[in-house]
Curated annotation (Swiss-Prot):
HAMAP family: His_tRNA_synth. It is an enzyme of class 6 (ligase). It comes from Wolbachia sp. subsp. Brugia malayi (strain TRS). It catalyses: tRNA(His) + L-histidine + ATP = L-histidyl-tRNA(His) + AMP + diphosphate + H(+). This is Histidine--tRNA ligase. It comes from the Bacteria. The keyword Signal does not apply. GO terms for cellular component: cytoplasm. GO terms for molecular function: ATP binding; histidine-tRNA ligase activity. Belongs to the class-II aminoacyl-tRNA synthetase family.
Amino acid sequence: MTNQTVRGTKDLLFDEWYRFKYIQQIANRISSLYGFLPAQTPIFEYTEVFMKTLGDGSDIINKEMYTFYDKGGKSITLRPEFTAAIVRLLVEKKLQIPIKLFSTGPAFRYERPQKGRQRQFHQINFEVFGVENPKADIELISLAHHLLTEFNISKNVRLEINSLGDSETIAKYKEVLIPYFKKFQNDLSEDSQNRLTKNPLRILDSKDEKDKLIISDAPKISDYYTRESSDFFEQILNGLTALNIPCTVNSKLVRGLDYYCHTVFEFVIEDFGAQGAVFAGGRYDNLVSSVGGKYTPAIGFAGGIERIMELINYSMKGDRPICLVPIGREAEEHALTLANELRRNGLYVIYEYNGALKNRMKKASQANAKAALIFGNEELGSKTLKIKNMDTGEEKIIAYGNIMENIHQTLLV
């Protein structure tokens, strides 16, 4: 047991690590194109940070948080998501708004491990604070679509979107939704029965098959939009159409957290079944004020890196090395100096010291080297090196004095 990873965690090695870093690099680059600034919060916060923001009706609060008491008796929680911590950061640091923040890192939830879902997972997270205009929603959804295009998976993913309306809309909707579900209270799942008194909208998010039958005939929130809510949502749909981003209005989409209002959306792929969201987010205009900050309209979304890793066809094995093959003691000693020079000039260098030349060249090939630099006492005396292009098999003698230029000319690196 001691030599196994904890259930729901995963080691990242070799190809998986390169795929992981590739996703982060693209997210960093795209975030800059849209004017997002980097922000990083600790992986744990005071538990109160999440209790205040996520709502006592959420699965995260009730079932999934990793919470413990530190030696000072303070209740601490490993972050289960980013938004609560970013809101804490915004309020504590008194950041000037409007502002766009991008963050990435690990998060933790105690849930059943499955394809693309771990108990320790990594997210890319985008938040926009201080913009009430629906154009912020359109731009953020466009950014998410841009990322999927960069990952070359946009054709396999569909955008589902809904509006929860403003607080007046939600209040009117609850007045009809609660009586509807109460008629079927004994037939609802245990989770949905608990949600009926805490946050009945969350029942619409149930994946239970019996619940789905009841939900299918539930009243639609769109019938209770205020004029302002309806206009806001229509502007978003029109904006997405103008950007050629297809979407499907899903009137049952509410998202899993209690703080959302107006826009909620998910980019969904069937490969992950009932838990098929690759990116998900929405608007939360009242969240900052609920934790003691000023009223700050906001919208954000997050995506799980492990999920994206399951979908992309990225097989880069990192930079291909240049392999040094010294022959003889003097050449072996010189190889250290040569390797240092090449690395200082930005080249990835490995050594092959042991065995016959044929075996060492075989190992260089197995290491996917793009070239081998072969040298012994004779080459050291004439200040030359033999370079072999491992792809073409071509060999040539190059001058040591101009080594970087000669390597570039030979390999076009």
